[in-house]
A protein has these predicted regions:
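Alpha-helical segment proximal to the catalytic Tyr-Lys
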Residues: 35-36, 77-81, 140
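A glycine/serine/threonine-rich, flexible loop-to-helix segment
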Residues: 81, 93-116
Length: 156
């Protein structure tokens, strides 16, 4: 995720790299894993609230996260009869190393998450259990869903 103020500033190489990182890699890893999955297995992808309510400065990133939603829902339909569940998590603003490495305009980092009802960004530990639950048998009848964790904005 690298912010970009204008479509004209985004190069084809940057656009391609974002898709290769977020969409192609997920496709290749999932395809490679399929031979190792059996009934009761779970795939949990990472999308983003940007798939549903994109900021102007993350145009290519938001597109990839929307593609992950479609991939998740479609693959859940393909694999359901095999007993393999496919879901996604769509985080809102979370504090990660990505934020300080160009994922956000640096002047906006201090106010990151202030637009949520919780008035702060989430911490990775606050979303980890969602991934664990979706991967566990506790979610055995949950597939094709996107679970949002966005500090109360109710994106989905």
């Amino acid at each position: 995720q690298q912010y970009c103020e204008s479509l004209e500033e985004r190069t084809t190489a940057d656009f391609d790299a974002t898709f290769k990182t977020n969409v192609y890699a997920m496709f290749w890893i999932t395809r490679a894993a399929l031979n190792h999955l059996s009934a009761g297995s779970a795939i949990v992808n990472t999308s983003s609230v940007q798939a549903f309510d994109p900021d102007a400065i993350v145009l290519d990133y938001a597109q990839t996260k929307a593609a992950i939603v479609a991939f998740t829902k479609s693959l859940a339909k393909q694999l359901g009869s095999e007993g393999i569940r496919v879901n996604a998590v769509a985080p809102g603003p979370y504090w990660t190393p990505l934020q300080v490495s160009g994922g956000q305009p640096q002047e906006k980092i201090v106010s990151m998450g202030s637009g949520t009802p919780m008035d702060r960004p989430g911490q990775p530990v606050e979303i980890a259990s969602l991934y664990v639950t979706l991967a566990s048998d506790e979610s055995s009848y949950c597939s094709g869903q996107v679970w949002c964790a966005d500090g109360g904005n109710g994106t989905l």
